[in-house]
Amino acid sequence: FVYHASRLGAEGYAISAVGDDGLGREILEELDNNSIRYLIEKVPYPTGTVQVTLQDGVPDYIINERVAWDHLSPTSNAIDLAERADAICFGTLGQRSAQSRETIQAILSFAPDDAYRCFDINLRQHYYTKELIEESLYLANMLKVNDGELVVLRICFIWKERTRRCSLVYRTL
């Protein structure tokens, strides 16, 4: 999100955390090389990693736990950015730990009322609950969802005929 926003001329920032390790340094260097602004804390946990495999073109993820981005904190700089944001993108995966969930929701609470709050639902493995989805939907005014995630939403919220209409809206966006 921030990469594309930055390339389109917006003042985008990545807010996250990395470990004080080689992967963390590599990420920061890559962000610098691509002129992407960021507020990234170095925390005493390893930088997050994900193993991705493809089965018939469909990705499967193994997302490591107890990593840096599970330990976000609501810094004053992040709150300052939120207070002047035109758009904020967040998802369920980033909220998998209680600490990061509280941080993301706190940061969102400082955004202006007219800011876009894009909930990129990102349903991965067991890192979401119906309650987390509901909380996040209430915080959002825009939803990014794929076909597979739409099926999960239908099951979670017992949508029947509405699913067809929702998928038509999604496909026309």
Located regions from the model:
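Ribokinase/PfkB-type carbohydrate-kinase core domain
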Residues: 30-41, 55-173
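Substrate-binding N-lobe of the ribokinase-like
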Residues: 1-50, 54-58, 65-71
